[in-house]
């Protein structure tokens, strides 16, 4: 079966997010009242697997090996 997978990769909450801070400052300059902005990545893919659990495990392995940097980021996986 083919499963649609959505992966969210975000900076660790303990770390400064310079891109988020820049956007937060720019929005404030434009009059928007937005705070605690974090900028990350959204990855959408299809995985061929026997089950939803196998698709999740496959996506998790891809994240650990390539799609995220564990020193600076965390990830969340949603198999649809």
For each feature predicted by the language model, list its residue ranges.
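Long, contiguous binding/interaction regions
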Residues: 2-42, 46, 51-80
């Amino acid at each position: 079966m083919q499963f649609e997978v959505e992966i969210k990769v975000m900076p660790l909450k303990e770390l400064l997010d310079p891109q988020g801070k820049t956007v937060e400052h720019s929005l404030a300059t434009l009059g928007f009242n937005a705070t605690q902005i974090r900028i990350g990545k959204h990855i959408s893919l299809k995985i061929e697997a026997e089950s939803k659990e196998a698709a999740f495990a496959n996506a998790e392995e891809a994240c650990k090996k390539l799609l995220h940097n564990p020193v600076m980021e965390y990830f969340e996986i949603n198999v649809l």
